Amino acid sequence: MANVVVVGAQWGDEGKGKIVDWLSEQADVVVRFQGGHNAGHTLVVGEAVYKLSLLPSGVVRPNTLGVIGNGVVLDPYALASEIDRLAGQGVTVSRENLRVADNATLILSLHRELDALREDGAPGTKIGTTKRGIGPAYEDKVGRRAIRLMDLAEPETLPPKIERLLAHHNALRRGFGLEEISEQTILDELTGIAERVLPYQDTVWRLLDDARRGGKRILFEGAQGALLDVDHGTYPFVTSSNTVAGQAATGSGLGPRAIGYVLGIAKAYTTRVGEGPFPTELHDEIGQRIGERGHEFGTVTGRKRRCGWFDACLVRQTVKTSGIDGIALTKLDVLDGFDEIRVCTAYDIDGQRFDHLPASQAAQQRAVPVYETIPGWSGTTAGARSWADLPAQAIKYVRRIEELIGAPVALLSTSPERDDTILMHNPFED
């Protein structure tokens, strides 16, 4: 019996929510291990639709424990708001179904403000952040000046920690010509939310180790996608954390040998939100058609996603950098009815052929996709639940993707409904 890590194999928005929800039915514990409330996902459970940004998917499922690990940066007010929103939908979040790492870094209002100032004040060099303070909070974590969840339980220790934090942030604010923030303002912000979030704190690394030793099935839920990884993504147009599967260990406190099966999620085409290179992006009516059929708008921001053909080079890179054992291929039904479908198999950069996207930002901008054209299919894949339900050419398309990325398709999703899934291999039974 394996534990399972779910990671996005592209630039996020791959449909992880549905796959995690489908897998969480078999899991005892669901763990968030990186990111913050900057990436959302939609869960469809029966007739109910839940939109989560910070809470693990397990909290909406009975008898499943949701865990927010130390690798997550936590906005305590966003957490309280999301808990209240679920309560309005009839889902009670308590210590019985949610624990938060006591050493998780907190996102404060000054982080959100700094994030927005940088993004709005950088014409032509925007990264495409959600302005929710994720990056600045990670900066403070690495700079060893962050306020952590456990600090709220010891209010008498907060003043010197706030003083250290503001020594940095007020210097930045002076540079922006902004009024400095007082220590009392931050203290009030922290003490005002403490009683809402402290009941969930726990020593998560020990909790997860006990669960593992007790034979519990643990599902690690990644946010964003591996191509947004701060090291392995299209830097600097990336998120502020590691999003590859290895972060599941670091961001939860569980040893790397306990991670188990790595399931990568990839769309049957490619999308991206915000700025950054996108070799297969389509600016024509085909790209518009894919976006409209796939309802490609961000869960958190509502931003329109950029759309393009499937990029086998990028997913193949992700298979290697995340150690992916199998792929869940989503939104195959969006490609129904295309006469032909193109897949990027290599790049041409200044006359030289590359089988991967170089780390150089300049080279990425000059990368021209080399395509293989595959016949489309006239039948429908929407709602298919077995191979027998799929058009023959759709099966050929899936098999060709497997060959190009060097990993098998373990699950195939054919609609947003959780049961419209074709299972080839159950990751928990690896």
Curated annotation (Swiss-Prot):
Its cofactor is Mg(2+). The active site is at D13, H41. Pathway: Purine metabolism; AMP biosynthesis via de novo pathway; AMP from IMP: step 1/2. It is an enzyme of class 6 (ligase). Mg(2+) binds at D13, G40. The keyword Hydrolase does not apply. It comes from the Bacteria. It holds the Pfam family Adenylsucc_synt. Binds 1 Mg(2+) ion per subunit. GO terms for molecular function: adenylosuccinate synthase activity; GTP binding; magnesium ion binding. GO terms for cellular component: cytoplasm. Plays an important role in the de novo pathway of purine nucleotide biosynthesis. Catalyzes the first committed step in the biosynthesis of AMP from IMP. Homodimer. This is Adenylosuccinate synthetase.
